[in-house]
């Protein structure tokens, strides 16, 4: 088939991959930084600082998955039935995926887990984006401060090693 007749991809590849199983979610919950507001909780794990743990023939799924592909971040969505019916839950998930796609450069190298609360449905997209950006930038600032403190030998911050 000639190249002129071949259809181009209509959608670019998404800049994120999803967290796949309970152990990946649990790792982000345990080792990640968390931030809460009235609308959702955000758990962030910096994968560039995580040393890959390799056993016999076993690759660490979180840190190796970013290197294997051209994905920028890993995304997990945990939307409870308490948030609303399926239509409301799916709307929230679509909005959160869209936020990560729009701000892929900010999310680069992170594993993110969103846990929306029931009030999240009542936010419009722009208010949700504002809260997301505030939380993500404050977490990144806190992580940078904690990393500097760890390098100095100070452990008064709640930095995780």
From Swiss-Prot:
Keywords: Endonuclease, Hydrolase, Nuclease, RNA-binding, tRNA processing. The keyword Heme does not apply. InterPro entries: Ribosomal_Su5_D2-typ_SF (IPR020568), Ribsml_uS5_D2-typ_fold_subgr (IPR014721), RNase_P (IPR000100), RNase_P_CS (IPR020539). Gene3D superfamilies: 3.30.230.10. Pfam families: Ribonuclease_P. GO terms for molecular function: 3'-tRNA processing endoribonuclease activity; ribonuclease P activity; tRNA binding. Its EC number is 3.1.26.5. It comes from the Bacteria. One of its GO terms (biological process) is tRNA 5'-leader removal. One of its GO terms (cellular component) is ribonuclease P complex. It catalyses: Endonucleolytic cleavage of RNA, removing 5'-extranucleotides from tRNA precursor. Consists of a catalytic RNA component (M1 or rnpB) and a protein subunit. Belongs to the RnpA family. RNaseP catalyzes the removal of the 5'-leader sequence from pre-tRNA to produce the mature 5'-terminus. It can also cleave other RNA substrates such as 4.5S RNA. The protein component plays an auxiliary but essential role in vivo by binding to the 5'-leader sequence and broadening the substrate specificity of the ribozyme. This is Ribonuclease P protein component. It comes from Helicobacter pylori (strain J99 / ATCC 700824).
């Amino acid at each position: 088939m000639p190249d002129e007749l071949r259809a181009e991809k209509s959608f670019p590849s998404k800049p994120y991959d999803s967290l796949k199983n309970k152990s990946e979610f649990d790792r982000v919950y345990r080792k990640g930084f968390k931030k809460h507001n009235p609308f959702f909780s955000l758990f962030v794990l910096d994968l560039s600082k995580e040393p890959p743990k390799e056993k016999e023939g076993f690759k660490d799924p979180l840190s190796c998955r970013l290197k294997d592909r051209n994905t920028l971040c890993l995304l997990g969505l945990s939307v409870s039935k308490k948030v609303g019916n399926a239509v409301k839950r799916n709307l929230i998930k679509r909005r959160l995926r869209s936020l990560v796609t729009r701000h892929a450069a900010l999310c680069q190298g992170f594993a993110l887990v969103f846990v929306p609360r029931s009030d999240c449905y009542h936010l419009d997209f722009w208010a949700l984006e504002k809260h997301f950006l505030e939380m993500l930038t404050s977490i990144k600032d806190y992580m940078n401060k904690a990393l500097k403190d760890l390098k100095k030998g100070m452990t008064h911050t709640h930095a995780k090693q």
